[in-house]
Amino acid sequence: APFVRSSATFHFAVDGIDATRETPFRVRYVPRRINAAGEGVADLAAVAVYEGVVAARPSEDAMTIAVVNCQKSFTGDLRWNEQGLWFPHAAVARHVAAQEPHLLYFAGDQIYEGDLTPAITAPIKDALLDYLHKWYRHGWSFGELTRRLPSVVVPDDHDVYHGNVWGNAGVREPETGDLTVQDRGGYKMPPEFVNAVHRTQVEHLPAPRGEPTLEVGITTYHTTLSWGGGSFAVLADR
């Protein structure tokens, strides 16, 4: 699979998995380096391996869904626990695991752009690295769950470095009157950034229904998911 630099992702699909049983998986990444002769060679000392399981389809009689959203990492003087620092959300992950869910639903604000470090919004190369740094925190917090449970993820406003997102087919409206960039239509970040967020958060979902890309160039992800005894609509309602 080709490497997508802006989102630091590889995208691939595996067919023929037996949904009636748990199936182990293993993803192996072998980076390449340039040797003294200027040739690209495998860097076997830096091989990375990621392992988990594809869960068996649950019974149609009952299914438990864990819903997680708005994962703040730090709130300054506001303390909802003994430290006021929630990352890496160990208590949340532990309590979710204790419920033994069959499906995870991350309902938005998987990150907050200003948490722990200020948001970088330009230039685009630096903004993408800033986002990836904060997205990796999400994997750090919930990776032990997502490596063994199917997950539905829906981005919200802070995932795309926005305080509010007001539809308008993604088209950024001009600033008028007292409507700031946060409160007018569309995304304030460019399509390249929004699409990188989509590749990291929603690319694993079933293929979108309808047009895969808006006129402004932003990808879509509204789709359907059937799992166990449930049939779900995944909506991009921002």
Task: Name these PLM-found stretches.
Residues 1-238:
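Metal-dependent phosphoester/phosphodiester hydrolase catalytic core
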